């Protein structure tokens, strides 16, 4: 028979064990609940993502929106990703970033929408505070980021200068000097030594020297023999690259990094210090030169900086050094990158389409033959302005390159009042709008089923070049902000391209990687390594 005391002891032990187990279960209950919540949340997010993917062609995640898709695109080719989404969504889609960021916008490639925002409702779609704040450190209040009266004032003065006889003469003279005294000797040296050369780098140096002559009235010498490293040119490129990173970084984060002087913001600050030092030194020197010219009664300069120095603001006061700096930096950005980058893609496309190159060379030779005079021994052939104008097929080939690879692949606006696009997209006040020029060149609805093919003939009517609507072909923008330097850019590209193609066949190095770089303008990420052979 069991002892009662033993029974009590056993009962007590069992009770203690049960209580202990109960308390242990209670302790792990919160962990189990947390696990259940996490599992349920994960299932919800997965189902939500699948539904959104089927519905919109792009996953929209709770809290973080479409950020994962954007990050994947940034690792590969963001421009092709945008094009794919636009094609799937009929030409317009709303990008939803994380709820706590500024990465919310409407992206469009519909020509009707572009005409609406660039012309019809121009005043309702300024660059806006978001764009201005993002590029302020680099571009200041220059023409690319300015709105309203500040923009109109610069636009009017620059327009008068661009159409003046003095400026046109300066552009033609400086281009002849740079192409024949620097560009061609650099290429000939590479040919003689059979050395591959980065043509994009060479062209960037050409246009940088050219635009600095026009904007500042100085020659930085980037294209001199040996291709020297020019601190200002290097700093300018660093600053533009660092600025573009802000557009894919939440505003609060890049501003915090700027305050702490860390990461990309430190790089931007250091490069801008060199840019500003160069610009302000040039401005100070020019002021002294103009004082001497006024004292002697001479007036020989026609560069952009000098023109604005002689103007007065609304209070009849000279413009500030900061204002002058902003103007020149903006025009250098426009003049340096756009033409050179376009030419780099143009030569790459010719390498892939030799039949187009043959037609261009035939056109150039025919125009030279029309001179009716033989070249003198040792005299270098220099194309005349009227001959460059006759190069219609070359202009078509350059336009086709710009259609597929626009120098500015995307641009930005911000709506200041509630609007509705012609395609029915509703825009609330403050909405950021991205118009994708790169994608427009790859839309069957705009250019037909052969939109991805390189066909200069689509620009010709009975052998004559015919331009397209600025809202279909937006490489030079449209409406009141149509590029002031469009005619100069075409002349510069045609003169440089014809001077090269008349003398050399340009071959891209085998297996050279080609990809666009994420930047304000459409650089080739790895440059364009080429070799040159003399034409017969």
For every predicted segment, state its role:
Residues 354-356, 433, 486-522:
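Cytochrome P450 heme-binding "Cys pocket" and the immediately downstream C-terminal segment
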Residues 163-165, 239-245, 267-343, 369-387, ...:
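Conserved cytochrome P450 catalytic core segment spanning the I/J/K helices
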Residues 69-93, 274-281, 379-425:
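Conserved cytochrome P450 K-helix E-x-x-R motif and the immediately C-terminal K′/meander segment
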Residues 2-8, 16-153, 174-185, 271-274, ...:
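N-terminal membrane-proximal hinge/A-helix region immediately C-terminal to the signal-anchor transmembrane segment
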Residues 207, 211, 216, 271, ...:
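Central I-helix of cytochrome P450 enzymes
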Residues 2-44, 96-106, 166-177, 187-213, ...:
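Cytochrome P450
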Residues 405, 435-464:
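Conserved cytochrome P450 K-helix/beta-meander segment immediately N-terminal to the heme-binding cysteine loop
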Residues 160, 459-493, 519:
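Cytochrome P450 heme-thiolate "Cys pocket" and heme-binding signature region
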């Amino acid at each position: 028979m069991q002892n009662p005391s033993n029974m009590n002891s056993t009962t007590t032990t069992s009770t203690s064990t049960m209580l202990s187990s109960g308390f242990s279960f209670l302790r792990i209950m919160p962990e189990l609940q947390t696990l259940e919540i996490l599992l349920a949340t994960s299932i919800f997010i997965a189902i939500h993502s699948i539904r959104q993917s089927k519905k919109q062609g792009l996953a929209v995640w709770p809290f973080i929106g479409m950020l994962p898709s954007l990050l994947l695109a940034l690792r590969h080719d963001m421009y092709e990703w945008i094009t794919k989404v636009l094609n799937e969504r009929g030409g317009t889609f709303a990008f939803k970033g994380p709820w706590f960021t500024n990465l919310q916008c409407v992206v469009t490639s519909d020509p009707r929408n572009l005409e609406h925002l660039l012309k019809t409702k121009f005043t309702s779609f300024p660059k806006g505070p978001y764009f201005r704040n993002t590029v302020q450190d680099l571009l200041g209040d220059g023409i690319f980021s300015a709105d309203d009266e500040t923009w109109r004032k610069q636009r009017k003065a620059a327009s008068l200068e661009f159409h003046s006889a003095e400026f046109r003469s300066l552009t033609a003279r400086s281009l002849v000097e740079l192409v024949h005294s620097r560009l061609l000797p650099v290429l000939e040296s590479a040919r003689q030594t059979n050395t591959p050369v980065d043509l994009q780098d060479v062209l960037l140096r050409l246009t940088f020297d050219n635009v600095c002559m026009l904007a500042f009235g100085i020659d930085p010498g980037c294209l001199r023999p040996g291709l020297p490293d020019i601190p200002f040119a290097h700093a300018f490129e660093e600053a533009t690259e660092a600025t573009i990173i802000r557009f894919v970084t939440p505003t609060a984060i890049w501003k915090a990094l700027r305050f702490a002087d860390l990461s990309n913001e430190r790089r931007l600050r250091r490069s801008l210090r060199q840019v500003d030092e160069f610009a302000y030194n040039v401005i100070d020197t020019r002021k002294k030169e103009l004082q001497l010219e006024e004292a002697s009664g001479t007036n020989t300069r026609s560069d952009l900086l000098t023109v604005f120095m002689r103007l007065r603001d609304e209070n009849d006061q000279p413009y500030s050094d900061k204002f002058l700096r902003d103007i020149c930096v903006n025009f250098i950005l426009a003049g340096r990158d756009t033409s050179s980058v376009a030419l780099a893609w143009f030569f790459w496309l010719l390498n892939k389409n030799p039949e187009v190159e043959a037609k261009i060379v035939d056109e150039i030779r025919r125009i030279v033959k029309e001179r009716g005079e033989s070249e003198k021994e040792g005299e270098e052939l220099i194309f005349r302005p009227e001959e460059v104008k006759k190069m219609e097929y070359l202009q078509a080939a350059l336009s086709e390159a710009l259609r597929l690879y626009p120098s500015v692949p995307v641009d930005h606006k911000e709506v200041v009042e509630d609007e509705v696009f012609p395609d029915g997209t509703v825009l609330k006040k403050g909405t950021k709008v991205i118009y994708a020029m790169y994608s427009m060149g790859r839309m069957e609805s705009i250019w037909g089923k052969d939109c991805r093919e390189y066909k200069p003939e689509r620009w010709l009517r009975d052998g004559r070049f015919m331009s397209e609507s600025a809202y279909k072909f937006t490489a030079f923008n449209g409406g009141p902000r149509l590029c002031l330097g469009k005619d100069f850019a075409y002349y510069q590209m045609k003169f440089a391209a014809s001077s090269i193609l008349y003398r050399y066949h340009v071959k891209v190095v085998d297996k050279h990687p080609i990809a666009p770089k994420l930047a304000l303008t459409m650089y080739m990420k790895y440059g364009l390594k080429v070799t040159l052979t003399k034409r017969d």
